[in-house]
């Protein structure tokens, strides 16, 4: 078997001539490597810009919410102070009317005592 096994190959050399269909697959035919890398870089940069824009919007929303929460907290503090003042005023008013009611009961009791005394004195005579 001294003859060449591949009819396209010379004696002991690599095949010569165009490759036959159905031969070993070569590298995929596509854009050259630098162009593909540039395209991927542009896509990545576009994605980064999109994420940065979204993050800017999110930060703006967080700052807006923070200001609203601060305003709400201030209003809650003012409401708490007003509620405390109302509670103190209501307590004073309650005591005031309780004493007023006690005075009226004492006066009414005195009037009843005078009337009973007058009736007893009048009945005894």
Curated annotation (Swiss-Prot):
UniProt-annotated location(s): Cytoplasmic vesicle, Secretory vesicle, Synaptic vesicle membrane; Synapse, Synaptosome
Bilayer topology: Single-pass type IV membrane protein
Cytoplasmic side: 1-103
GO aspect biological process, one term: vesicle-mediated transport
TM segment ranges: 104-123
Residue span, v-SNARE coiled-coil homology domain: 40-100
Database matches in InterPro entries: Synaptobrevin-like (IPR001388), Synaptobrevin/VAMP (IPR016444), V_SNARE_CC (IPR042855)
Region (Disordered): 1-46
Lineage of origin: Eukaryota, Metazoa, Spiralia, Lophotrochozoa, Mollusca
Sorted UniProt keywords: Coiled coil, Cytoplasmic vesicle, Membrane, Synapse, Synaptosome, Transmembrane, Transmembrane helix
The name this protein goes by in its record: Synaptobrevin
Physiological role: Intrinsic membrane protein of small synaptic vesicles.
Family: Belongs to the synaptobrevin family.
